[in-house]
Swiss-Prot record:
The lineage of its organism: Eukaryota, Fungi, Dikarya, Ascomycota, Taphrinomycotina. Residues 521-534 have a biased composition (Low complexity). Keywords: Cytoplasm, Nucleus, Protein transport, Transport. Belongs to the STXBP/unc-18/SEC1 family. Residues 684-693 have a biased composition (Basic residues). InterPro entries: Sec-1-like_dom1, Sec-1-like_dom3a, Sec1-like, Sec1-like_dom2, Sec1-like_sf. This is Protein transport protein sec1. Transmembrane segments: none annotated. It is found in: Cytoplasm; Nucleus. GO terms for biological process: intracellular protein transport; vesicle docking involved in exocytosis; vesicle fusion; vesicle-mediated transport. It comes from the Eukaryota. The gene is sec1. Residues 665-676 have a biased composition (Basic and acidic residues).
Length: 693
């Protein structure tokens, strides 16, 4: 089961576990939760789960007295205040159910317990779903500013607080996967940079959270799958962010203007040229098939599959085979009866062709070759390159070369040389015609342990204890010889060869407690720690979790997919962000900028409209307001939800009328397959009401 499927499954099971007297319920989520669920479910799917309407918690709303309310939110005091605000309206929800997506602290529960809505609260639960599944094996936690917070000097005093938030997000993934991991971390004790303890601190915070949870749920540790969680940070591999990658996913994100996983393109249709916006996600089977292939292999796969489609489809008139990307684009114009397939092929053919055009124009074959020599420390013959600088200078002197390409080459050269003297750096800057303002990028790289400037008397030190090139004789493209450090580390971990000094255990674990292939458990909608051990043997694949603090790369994502297939394991990778090389340059340029220029979300006044709205008895109920994708996402997930109920006190009350289903729009109404009847008050039975507190 993929992370997307897992999270969707758990989310729906949590919704369906909430029993309302009104049968149907209003779902109210905060904006951050809306962003999470938009990746794996559509509003139309929610309406099929007895959800009458979906609304945003922070927006002004008028409660609907015909339905009970299900609030799904993060455990923040301001968001709880939004729930309390609803009670100020004349029309009020007859019952309230609350699900927190992350661990909730006792003061917040006490605030609900002593509030005026306490008697209406039916259930309070915690569903550990505070993470965003972006791919079948990739997730993000917290927010995209996290990496910058970890390295910006203004945040030095609150680094542990930031890492704690990240640790809670990782823990949500652990509970969702039903694992109680042995935790290891990257800890280069002798490294000179101050951030060398980052992974160690994060790993220990995660360990404390796991131990606290297990102390409150004694059965969890025994029933959960035993696995390994590896915590590393960006300093593990400082070369990977700057390399030109020539696998499909990495290359299109490096060279093309992809924003929020969307790419604008044009398609030739029966009526002429049509504009489209392609969405890159796991619903696109063409994309998931080729995203980790080398671009040449990806193009061959596209052409092969397209030609096979032409042969198999008797309705397709033009039976001639495509021999080039241009042939395929022309033939796609006749696929009007297969619009979804046509759009997918057109999107990826367009991107592949544009990448190859840029490859030729920017002479990336020459640039990529020297990048591989610098990053691996060897040439294609496996020997130490002797003429790196003489090959590098013409590329830096090239007037038409991209500035970002020159900076990336210089960074890789400095990493290769383990630093250069200051005068040499200035000479290289002049060759490259770079502004001195770009010097900040090089200086900031030192925060990750990379030596940039050295004295003539300084000796070069061995930066890494791992090899970053494939053994001689391996079948690999010359421009793809570099092996991400994370891949080497994970393979050593799988083979039980990982250095315990450089990658120590936390939680007093030892190598003898490593997981075995049989120690796994099945997923279901109930908390996984309640499942019997006999169920565990049905899942043979071992789970492994790796988290890269500070941000990850597309090559590292690919690594986890490759090793999962190679070793028959479920390896999941997480971070706070995945950047393209140019985004990494922008990231490293910001470390010394004034804090006000960076616009951290926490520095802006938080504007919550619903707390400022004045209740009006004549207010018209607003339509559900949630940003959902236009296409259905193939995602599902599971998480181990944990109840935090207090003893329930029963009280009597009458059942409320059910109004007609409020659709979010006319379009939604047309798409709804199920008609919802209007219930009257003819019920003679009185429903029992109870407060969770």
């Amino acid at each position: 089961m993929t992370l997307l499927e897992l999270q969707k499954e758990l989310f729906l099971s949590k919704i369906n576990s909430v029993e309302c007297a009104t049968k149907w319920k209003v779902l109210i989520v905060d904006t951050k939760t809306a962003d999470i669920i938009n990746h794996f479910i559509t509003i139309h799917s929610l309406l099929e789960e007895k959800i009458a309407a979906v609304e945003i918690l922070e927006n002004p709303r008028t409660p609907n007295s015909s339905f009970e309310a299900l609030y799904i939110l993060h455990s923040e005091e301001k968001l709880v205040d939004c729930i309390l605000k609803d009670e100020e309206y004349d029309k009020r929800y007859p019952g309230i159910h609350i699900v927190f997506l992350d661990m909730v602290k006792e003061p917040l529960i006490n605030k609900l317990r002593t509030s005026r809505i306490a008697s209406k609260i039916r259930t309070v639960q915690v569903a550990y779903l505070d993470f965003t599944s972006l791919e079948s094996r990739y997730f993000q936690v917290h927010d995209s500013f996290s990496g910058l917070r970890l390295y910006h000097p203004s945040n030095a005093a609150i680094i542990r607080q930031e890492l704690s938030k990240v640790a809670h997000g990782i823990f949500s993934v652990c509970v969702s996967l039903g694992i109680s991991p042995n935790i290891r971390c990257y800890y280069p004790k002798n490294a000179p940079h101050a951030s060398k303890t980052m992974s160690f601190i994060l790993a220990n915070q995660l360990s404390e959270i796991v131990e606290e949870y297990c102390s409150k749920h004694p059965g969890y540790h025994e029933a959960a799958s035993k696995s390994t969680c590896l915590i590393v940070d960006r300093s593990l591999d400082t070369a990977a962010p700057f390399l030109h990658e020539f696998t499909y996913q990495a290359m299109i994100h490096d060279l093309l203007p992809i924003k929020n996983e969307q790419y604008p393109y044009e398609i030739l249709g029966p009526q002429g040229t049509e504009k489209r916006t392609g969405k890159l996600d796991d619903d696109d089977l063409v994309y998931t098939t080729i995203r980790h292939m080398h671009m040449r292999d990806a193009i061959e796969k596209l052409m092969k599959d397209f030609n096979q489609f032409c042969i198999d489809n008797t309705l397709f008139l033009d039976k001639e085979r495509a021999t080039s990307l241009n042939d395929m684009r022309s033939m796609l114009a006749g696929l009007s009866d297969f619009q979804e397939l046509r759009d997918q092929y057109s999107l990826h053919l367009t991107m592949a062709q544009e990448c190859m055009n840029i490859f030729e124009k920017q002479q990336l074959n020459l640039i990529g070759a020297i990048e591989q020599d610098l990053s691996t420390g060897s040439n294609v013959e496996g020997k130490v390159p002797r003429s790196v600088l003489s090959e590098l200078l013409p590329l830096l002197d090239e007037g038409n070369a991209e500035e970002s390409t020159k900076i990336r080459l210089l960074l890789l050269y400095i990493i290769y040389r383990d630093g250069i003297i200051l005068q040499d750096l200035f000479r290289l800057f002049r060759h490259s015609n770079l502004s001195t303002s770009r010097e900040q990028i090089f200086q900031n790289l030192e925060q990750l342990g990379t030596r940039v400037i050295k004295n003539l008397t300084d000796q070069s030190s061995k930066r890494k204890e791992v090899a970053n090139s494939l053994p001689a004789g391996e079948d690999v493209y010359e421009l793809s010889r570099y092996v991400p450090t994370l891949k080497v580390v994970l393979e050593n971990l799988i083979q039980d060869k990982l250095d315990p000094e450089l990658f120590p255990y936390v939680r007093n674990t030892t190598p003898q407690t490593e997981v075995s292939m049989e120690q796994t458990s099945l997923r279901s909608s109930r908390p996984s720690w309640t499942r019997s051990r006999s169920m565990a043997s049905k899942l043979p694949r071992e789970k492994m979790l790796v988290f890269v603090a500070g941000g990850t790369t597309f090559s590292e994502l690919r690594t986890c997919y490759e090793l999962s297939d190679k070793y028959n394991k479920d390896i999941y990778i997480g971070s706070t962000v995945c950047y393209s090389p140019n985004e990494w340059l922008d990231f490293f340029s910001k470390f010394q900028q004034p804090r006000e220029a960076l616009k951290f979300p926490e520095d802006k006044p938080r504007h919550i409209p619903c707390l400022e709205a004045r209740p009006s008895p004549n207010r018209i109920q607003e339509q559900p307001n949630i940003d959902v994708p236009s296409t259905r996402y193939e995602n599902t997930s599971s998480s181990d939800a944990v109840s935090i109920h207090k003893d329930e006190k029963k009280s009597k009350g009458k059942s409320h009328k059910l109004g007609k289903l409020m659709m979010s729009s006319k379009k939604d109404k047309d798409k709804s397959k199920e008609k919802v009847p209007t219930y009257g008050t003819s019920d003679k039975k009185k429903k029992k009401r109870f407060g969770v507190f």
